[in-house]
């Protein structure tokens, strides 16, 4: 697979007295990720993965609003787009695949002194510490927690909703902590029902 990436700063933060908009830094970016897989010779001939599919195209929007001292209010939204499904390109996406997905949506406070506290759908502590450093090639995550649990976006191993997360650096140590709040039932479509009551990571 290969990707084309870009990020543009639409508003650059430069706080000025009497100008609330000058406190805002706003960026947009993303990556387009076409992918081709040929893992089993002719055994998968004609499959959408062999024909070419979307390997995780996403577009992101990030805002950083300076409040006072070294404290900022931050917000982040990342939209996943399945381009072949969006344009209905036959044999280039899985049956039933959605056109778009909400990859992340969170908000919170950031401080160089006190750290960062955010709430919403965001990368897990596990992904920040392990996944982000090893998720380099296609299928790297199959052997990680998100590839082995019921659903990484639900069980807390990847990008769970309703997550409160804190991170900060103390000397040479990076500290990450999170708490997962109860979520609605997850129905994978195989007759099973999962219910997340809570959870946490450190």
Can you describe what each PLM-predicted range is?
Residues 42-44, 89-96, 184-195:
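Solvent-exposed loop segments that connect transmembrane elements
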Residues 174-202:
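Loop-centered beta-sheet repeat module
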Residues 19-37, 48-182:
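Outer membrane beta-barrel
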């Amino acid at each position: 697979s290969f990707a084309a990436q870009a990020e543009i700063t639409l508003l650059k933060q430069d706080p000025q007295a009497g100008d609330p908009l000058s406190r805002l830094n706003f960026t947009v970016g993303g990556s387009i990720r076409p992918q081709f897989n040929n893992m089993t010779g002719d055994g998968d001939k004609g499959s959408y993965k062999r024909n070419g599919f979307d390997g995780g195209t996403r577009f992101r929007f990030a805002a950083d609003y300076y409040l006072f001292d070294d404290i900022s209010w931050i917000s982040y939204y990342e939209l996943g787009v399945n381009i072949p499904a969006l344009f209905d390109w036959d044999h280039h996406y899985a049956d039933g695949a959605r056109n778009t997905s909400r990859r992340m949506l969170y908000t919170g406070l950031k401080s160089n002194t006190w750290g960062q506290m955010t709430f919403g759908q965001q990368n897990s502590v596990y992904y920040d510490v392990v996944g982000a450093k090893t998720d380099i090639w296609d299928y790297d995550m199959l052997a990680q927690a998100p590839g082995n649990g019921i659903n990484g976006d639900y069980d807390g191993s990847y990008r769970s909703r309703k997550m409160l997360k804190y991170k900060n650096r103390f000397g040479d140590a990076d500290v990450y902590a999170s708490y997962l709040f109860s979520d609605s039932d997850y129905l994978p479509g195989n007759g099973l029902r999962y219910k997340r009551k809570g959870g946490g990571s450190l």
